[in-house]
Amino acid sequence: VERLKANLPANSTLAEFPSLFYVWVGMNLDNPKLKNIKLRQAIQAAIDVPSIMAASYFVAAEPSTGIIAPGLSGHRDQSLTGIEANLEKAKKLMAESGESNVSLKISVLNKSVNVTTAQIIQANLAAIGVTVEVDLHEGATFWGLGEDKTLELVLNRYSMTPDPYYATSWFITEQAGVWNWERFANAEFDKIHKDAQSESDLVKRDAMYQRAQDLMEESGAYKFITHEATPNVYRNTIVPALRPDGMPLYRYFKKD
């Protein structure tokens, strides 16, 4: 994006839009290697999101605070675990966990941005004594990993609609082992997901979805990374039809 800005093709426009995708690191709560919440919290504290933004996204994307994008009901201004790595906190949590010689595997869809992100996480966790193996998958095998009870860490990316109900729907208890790969099960979260659908008070609804994301982080099973970004380059001879999140609607494009 920065290169394009500096050398934009003649007679063209670069437009940048927020994205409805969300990227995170998940931890399988049913795996015995990740049962210790202090270990999971140490992993959360050790991951440095700004480094990922610089190396994987070339500073074209911003760190996220949860699964709900900015501008939508339920978006949080801050996450509970922070954006920058806190190695002092992470090392303290590791000591409190009593764990040593920890070795984990992070499963990743084989795309360059994901591989770079996984390598940064690998380096981050090495700083607190956790060895990480990057396990690359093609799409056919990656999207079946939710059924794998031995899954450890996973770098994942989902999309959502402008209504936050769609975002939380994948993390309820009944989705464990389907789309809820962390196998996160929380009765309060499930109730929020159900009740927020019919909540007409927008302030209350906003608070409910913020609380839902707090619960996800408090479980130690999630480290939120980014919503990514959606840049578009188009010729000035056309009038593009773009959704608010930047996704093109080609059938509605027309000549200027």
Residues covered by each model-derived region:
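Extracytoplasmic/peripheral linker and loop segments enriched in polar/acidic and small residues
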Residues: 38, 131-142, 169-236, 256
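Ligand/substrate-recognition segments at binding pockets and active sites
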Residues: 61, 95-160, 181, 202, ...
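Ligand-binding "clamshell"
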Residues: 2-15, 148-151, 164-178, 235-239
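Structural transition elements
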Residues: 34, 62-96, 113-116
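Long beta-strand-rich cores associated with HINT superfamily self-processing modules
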Residues: 232-256
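Periplasmic-binding protein-like
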Residues: 13-26, 30, 34-72, 116-117, 174-190, ...
